[in-house]
Amino acid sequence: MVLAQSAAATTVQELQLGWAVANYELDGDNQAARFEALIIEAEAAVEANPKDPELLIWQGILKSTYAGKASGLSALSLVKGARSSFEKALSIDDMAMQGSAYTSLGALYYQVPGWPIAFGSDKKARQMLEKAVQLNPAGIDSNYFHGDFLLQQKEYGAAKVAFEKALAAPDRLGRTLADSGRRGEIRSRLANIES
């Protein structure tokens, strides 16, 4: 059991680093190819460890991030797959990765179109993101996505507070590139609010 958990943890770390490189250092065809390869790796890891909520969360994160860069029906298929991964992770352990499935599912709900095209819902987004911040009040991602949602809702004061919390979040072990990239996104959002 310990060996299986260790192997899964290594896989999660590899997926995290791969995501950060693909998201913040690559673009164009190189980025697309890397995301596609990471999704295949995540699917294999989940197939080998179907009850691992962290692998499910990362499978969903990879699909949802790539969907944001894709278009048309392929993007819709990716976001539906991501939602399924997050929902499975929540059903296994909603506290995994400090409630990251709530953060990621909430982000999907406000970023995808609503019915009849997809499943987007500002109401569900707010519920999920508020739960995420409740579970991880000092987290960079929980506060960033909550702030981004509030910004889209034109709740500028609350968005600024959330972004400032995200900016002040402690660095995560082994996530230097991801944290640096996210802080850049936060500063950009804050500049938009303040201009």
Placement of each model-derived feature along the sequence:
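TPR alpha-solenoid repeat register
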Residues: L55, Q98-A101, S142, T176
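N-terminal leader/linker segments that initiate helical-solenoid repeat arrays
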Residues: L3-E41
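Short coil turns that delineate tetratricopeptide repeat
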Residues: P50, D94-A96, P137
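Terminal, low-structured helical/coil segments at or just beyond the last alpha-helical repeat
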Residues: Q152-Y156, K160-S195
